[in-house]
């Protein structure tokens, strides 16, 4: 190992290791325990080992080579207790308890968005891996019961806000060609199924324009006819969204039933004229607040008009309205979805597109994008009350509910399930029992929208 080592000033030392600096250190060359020094060195006769230079010949042997120790085996994967909420496989400790990714995300969204859920049973639903999406009220209560911390979510959110603010300065809000193409596709889908206010020839009616009544039958007949047409146009809009038709038919119907009223309310509120306090439908019919109440909106009227006023400062164009509608529709937290993960994957690029588009359009208003997203929560709240309004409306109208409006509300989240309140009809619709969740009903099926006799543009 060492062929010709000059030993300078050797002095005895108890140190068991060889000095690595043979030529410059004053410390002696120390002989190791395992006989590294050859016989020539062992025969060195001067027992004092002082001062003079000597040449010590050493020889290496295979037994003297340093063999590296084998690498330590990796530690075994950490095993967590099953999710405290649904007993699914846990991905770690989240917000204070062992939880799966699904329950972690559900709890975070619920707290961050201040979601208000309703249980339409007895507030004692069993929450497990299979049933966790059926009642969001009971699922949230279970999260809190097992110890999930709201404060942890808020702290996490504040940390993310700070990180996002730092990152925002570095981000370059440039639309990629694919994103531009998608925005144009959504804009076109919105414009083809919802003409803007400036394209309409307005007309009015004198029916019950001065005072509120329980229901004006003539206004209701006209309103329900227009609502049916608007539902069909909403289905056509959905069919043109990127990836929507790649979902199962059952999921397409589930999403349409859950979000249709959200989209209808958003659309009609973009046709609000604040100076006259009126709203205009797709055939040009323009109703004031009193007439909207009498046409069937009832106690929902003031909520809808307040929401319309809140939209005014946002000054949304067709692309933004279309993107926000698409985000409402493609929402993976709707109950009874077969492929909720795939729905979330379709929503993600829409969120990114809206973020970049809004920032480019308003470079000096960085908070406009989150303000728009918050409107989805408002829409869901109004939709939930709209679904409740339908129940009373069915008892007020002289005849039966139009079939498409009633079908749209069958098994909707706002009426039957305990889901996030996002279902409803076009200002009127029927509750009642219907087809099983996910069943393919012919008139709501996206594949039959074009064949409907009412599918012409309103």
From Swiss-Prot:
Pfam families, sorted: Hormone_recep, zf-C4
Biased composition regions of type Low complexity, renumbered to the chain: 436-458
Subcellular locations according to the entry: Nucleus
Annotated GO CC locations: nucleus
Record's keyword annotation contains Zinc-finger: yes
Induction, per UniProt: Induced by retinoic acid.
Modulating: annotated span: 1-79
Main localization (coarse): nucleus
Gene Ontology terms for molecular function: DNA-binding transcription repressor activity, RNA polymerase II-specific; nuclear receptor activity; RNA polymerase II cis-regulatory region sequence-specific DNA binding; zinc ion binding
Region described as Disordered: spans on this chain: 48-75, 411-458
Domain comment, as recorded: Composed of three domains: a modulating N-terminal domain, a DNA-binding domain and a C-terminal ligand-binding domain.
PANTHER family: NUCLEAR HORMONE RECEPTOR (PTHR24085), RETINOIC ACID RECEPTOR ALPHA (PTHR24085:SF8)
Role: Receptor for retinoic acid. Retinoic acid receptors bind as heterodimers to their target response elements in response to their ligands, all-trans or 9-cis retinoic acid, and regulate gene expression in various biological processes. The rar/rxr heterodimers bind to the retinoic acid response elements (RARE) composed of tandem 5'-AGGTCA-3' sites known as DR1-DR5. Required for hindbrain development and, in lateral plate mesoderm, for specification of the pectoral fins.
Identification of the protein by name: Retinoic acid receptor alpha-B
Species whose genome carries this gene: Danio rerio
Annotated gene: rarab
């Amino acid at each position: 190992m060492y062929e010709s080592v000059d030993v300078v000033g050797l002095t005895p030392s108890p140190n068991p290791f060889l000095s690595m600096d043979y030529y410059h250190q004053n410390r002696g060359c120390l002989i190791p325990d395992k006989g590294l020094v050859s016989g020539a060195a062992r025969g060195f006769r001067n027992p004092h080992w002082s001062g003079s230079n000597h040449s010590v010949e050493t020889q290496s042997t295979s037994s003297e080579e340093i063999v590296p120790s084998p690498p330590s085996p990796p530690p075994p994967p950490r095993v967590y207790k099953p999710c405290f909420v649904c007993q699914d496989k846990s991905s770690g400790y989240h917000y204070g308890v062992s939880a799966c990714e699904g329950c972690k995300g559900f709890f975070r969204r619920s707290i961050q968005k201040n979601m208000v859920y309703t249980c339409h049973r007895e507030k004692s639903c069993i929450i497990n891996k299979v049933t966790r999406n059926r009642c969001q009220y009971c699922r949230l209560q279970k999260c809190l019961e097992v110890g999930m911390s709201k404060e942890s979510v808020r702290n996490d959110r504040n940390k993310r806000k700070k990180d996002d603010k730092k990152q925002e300065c570095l981000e370059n809000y440039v639309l990629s060609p694919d994103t531009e193409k998608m925005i144009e596709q959504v804009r076109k889908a919105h414009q083809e199924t919802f003409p803007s206010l400036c394209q309409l020839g307005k007309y009015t009616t004198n029916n019950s324009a001065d005072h509120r009544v329980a229901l004006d039958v003539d206004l209701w007949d006209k309103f329900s006819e227009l609502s049916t047409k608007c539902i069909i146009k909403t289905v056509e809009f959905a069919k043109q969204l990127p990836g929507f038709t790649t979902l199962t038919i059952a999921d397409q119907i589930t999403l349409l039933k859950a979000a249709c009223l959200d989209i209808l309310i958003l659309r009609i509120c973009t046709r609000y004229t604040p100076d006259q306090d009126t709203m205009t439908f797709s055939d040009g019919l323009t109703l004031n607040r009193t007439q909207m109440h009498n046409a069937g909106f009832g106690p929902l009227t003031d909520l809808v008009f307040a929401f319309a006023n809140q939209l005014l400062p946002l000054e949304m164009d067709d692309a933004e309205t279309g993107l926000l509608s698409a985000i409402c529709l493609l929402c993976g937290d709707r109950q009874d979805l077969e492929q909720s993960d795939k729905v979330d994957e379709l929503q993600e690029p829409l969120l990114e597109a809206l973020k970049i588009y809004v920032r480019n359009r308003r470079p000096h208003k960085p908070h406009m994008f989150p303000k728009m997203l918050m409107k989805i929560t408002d829409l869901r709240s109004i939709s939930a009350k709209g679904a409740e309004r339908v129940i009373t409306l069915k008892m007020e109208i002289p005849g039966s509910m139009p079939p498409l409006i009633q079908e749209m509300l069958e098994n909707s989240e706002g009426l039957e399930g305990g889901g996030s309140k996002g279902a409803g009809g076009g200002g009127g619709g029927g509750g009642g029992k219907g087809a099983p969740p996910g069943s393919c009903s012919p008139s709501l099926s996206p594949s039959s929208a074009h064949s409907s006799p009412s599918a012409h543009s309103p």
